[in-house]
Structures are given as C-alpha cells and as structure tokens.
C-alpha cells in the first residue's frame, strides 16, 4: 500500500524523511512539502490522516523535571495558521478542497474540538473518543464525496 505524506514546512518533511530512512521504510513513503490546500490526490482512492495543530502540546518526558505528560501552554496555532487564516476558516477551506480533490477518499481527523465536523461542514461517519496524552480528543471519520451528500 503506497503511503503519501506531507507538511507545509520543509523542516517537518525533512524530519519525517530522515525518520523513515532510519526505520527502513523510506521507499514506501512519498513525502512532499506542500500546502494541504494545494495538494491534489496522488491516487484515485485512499485515506487521509490529519493531526492538525490545536494549540496545545504535551511536554516530553523530562522536559520539566517530573512533569511528563503535562500540557504545555497553548500556542498561536489555535488562533491562526501560517497564512493568517483562523482555524475555522482553514478547516472550512480544507473541507471544500477535499470534496473537490479527493472524492471517494476517507479522511480521519484527530481533534479536541467536538464541533469540528460543523466547522468543516462535513458529516462524520464515525466519532471515536481518544486521548492524546492528557488532551481529550475525537478521531473523526469523513467519507468524502464531490459536492454534497444531502438529498435534493
């Protein structure tokens, strides 16, 4: 199964490429530095996985003495993205892009925002409760179709 991965920041794709090489799986992964709002579907069908920034980080073990797993202060990622868009605007644009560029695909999004499906204007087909360290999240599944799933 081919794996396509990407990030808007070269630093992150370079980091992922080096980790994939160390793990011996680099040949199975196609990495691109690209904006998620610009990337076209690399195959007819597939699965998208997204763990977007949501303004909270989990401190790595030992970073503050015995504070392993505590939340770090929120970052600006909660309020805005690199192009200045708010999180709400970004997710609305992302959902529109996915419907146009990825019909027939499945998307999974990990988020602590329980209202994310409404912000994206997508109906989730699954909502799986999860914890990302101390952060309560949901893993949302969206079955992507071109246009709208609403009955006329």
Where are these regions (language model features)?
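Class I S-adenosyl-L-methionine-dependent methyltransferase catalytic core
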Residues: 1-152
């Amino acid at each position: 199964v081919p794996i396509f991965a990407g990030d808007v920041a070269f630093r992150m794709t370079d980091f992922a490429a080096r980790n994939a090489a160390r793990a011996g799986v680099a040949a199975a992964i196609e990495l691109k530095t690209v904006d998620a709002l610009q990337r076209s579907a690399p195959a007819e069908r597939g699965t998208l996985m997204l763990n977007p920034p949501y303004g909270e980080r989990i401190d790595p073990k030992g970073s503050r003495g015995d504070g392993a797993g505590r939340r770090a202060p929120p970052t600006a990622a909660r309020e805005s993205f690199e192009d200045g868009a708010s999180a709400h605007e970004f997710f609305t644009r992302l959902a529109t892009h996915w419907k146009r560029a990825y019909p027939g695909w499945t998307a999974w999004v990990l988020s602590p925002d329980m209202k994310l499906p409404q912000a994206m204007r997508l109906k989730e087909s699954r909502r799986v409760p999860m914890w990302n360290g101390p952060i309560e999240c949901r893993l949302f599944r969206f079955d992507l179709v071109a246009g709208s799933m609403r009955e006329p």
